[in-house]
C-alpha cells in the first residue's frame, strides 16, 4: 500500500511502528488556510459585454466588426427616378452588383461594407435574419448582428474555457476561477470537498491530515489505518494500548451532554460524535468510562461519612486526587482508550501515542 503524508511535522520510522514495509510518517502537516484561485486558471468569461473589452484568449477580433454605410447620393447620377420611385437606369450608368446575390442593384438605396455592395434585403443576420444597419459582424463568410455574434462566438468560447479548467480531486467537477480551494501535494480540492474519506468530516484550517493513495484522511482515521496494516503484517508483535487525547473543546461538548444525560441513546451519541468530530464508538466508550468513574466516586463519597459535600454533575479523571475544600475539577484533557472501538480483526502494533 502506497501512503503519503503532506509535509509531516512529526515523523515515525517504519521500524518504530513494526517490521512491516510501511515507510510513511504517521502525522500530516497542519492544514493551511484556503486560497482563492486567480491566475492559476483561465478567467471566467461569463461577464463579457458587447461594449466592454474582450479578453485576448477569446475568439472575438475587432477585424470581425464592420461599419455599414447606406449609399445613395454617390449613385444618384447613375439613375433617374420617377415620382413614383420607379427606377430607370441611364445607358452610361455604372452597374452595381450585390455581393450576396450577385444580381444587379437597381434600388434607390443600397448598403456598402468595406467596398462591397449589397441589397438592403440581402444584408441580414444569418442567425436571427434581422436586417443589419450601422454595425455588423462578418466571420467565416457569414454576417451576424451584434447580439448573435457574441452569443455564437464569445459566450460559447467562454463555456469551453470553463470546461477546460482544473478538476476537483474529490468531486471531479471543474474548479472555477472564483472558487475557494485547498491544495494537497499535486491535488486541488473545492473548499467543501476537502474532507476525510472515512468520516466525511470537512477538515478545518490548522488541522492535521494525511494523503493515502490520493484519499484524504483525518489524523484519527489515518492512525487507525496504520495500526490495522501493522497488525496484518506482523501477527507476533506485542500489542500496546493506544490512548486518545481529547481536545478542550471536545471535552467541553462531551461534559455538557454528560451533565444532561449520562447514558445517551444511539441517536444522541451520533449527534455528539458529529459535533466533536469523533467516531460514535469512541464517544460511546467515553460515556461508559465516565459513568464508571462517576459510580466509583459516588461509592467513595458515601463511605467518607459525609465529611465533605461535592458536586456530582460529572465524572472526575482517575488521575485527579480528592479535594474536600473545593468542587470537583474536570481535566482539560482526558484520555480514553479506543481499543474497544477498533474491530477485533485488527491487531494494534507498536507504540503510537500522541498529544
Curated annotation (Swiss-Prot):
Record's compositionally biased regions (Low complexity): 306-326
Molecular functions (GO terms): DNA-binding transcription factor activity; DNA-binding transcription factor activity, RNA polymerase II-specific; metal ion binding; RNA polymerase II transcription regulatory region sequence-specific DNA binding
Name of one Pfam family that matches: LIM
Gene3D superfamilies associated with the record: Cysteine Rich Protein (2.10.110.10), Homeodomain-like (1.10.10.60)
Tissues in which the UniProt entry reports expression: Expressed in the AWB sensory neurons and in one RME motor neuron (RMEV), two RMD motor neurons (RMDL and RMDR), the RID, RIV, SAA and SIA interneurons and the SMB sensory/inter/motor neurons.
One GO CC term on file: nucleus
Residue range(s) of DNA binding per entry: 239-298
Taxonomy, superkingdom: Eukaryota
SMART domains: HOX, LIM
Entry's localization field: Nucleus
Annotated stretches, region: Disordered: 291-336
GO biological process, one term: cell fate specification
Chief location of this protein within or outside the cell: nucleus
Record's keyword terms, sorted: DNA-binding, Homeobox, LIM domain, Metal-binding, Nucleus, Repeat, Transcription, Transcription regulation, Zinc
Domain LIM zinc-binding as annotated: residue spans: 96-155, 166-228
InterPro entries (alphabetical): HD (IPR001356), Homeodomain-like_sf (IPR009057), LIM_Homeobox_TF (IPR050453), Znf_LIM (IPR001781)
Functional note: Transcription factor that binds to the promoter of target genes. Regulates genes involved in serotonin synthesis and release in serotonergic ADF neurons. Involved in specification of neuron cell fate, olfactory receptor expression, locomotion, and foraging behavior. Required in AWB olfactory neurons to repress AWC cell fate and promote the AWB cell fate during early development.
Assembly description: Interacts with transcription factor sox-2.
PANTHER family the record matches: LIM/HOMEOBOX PROTEIN LHX (PTHR24208), LIM_HOMEOBOX PROTEIN AWH (PTHR24208:SF127)
Identification of the protein by name: LIM/homeobox protein lim-4
Biological source species: Caenorhabditis elegans
Gene: lim-4
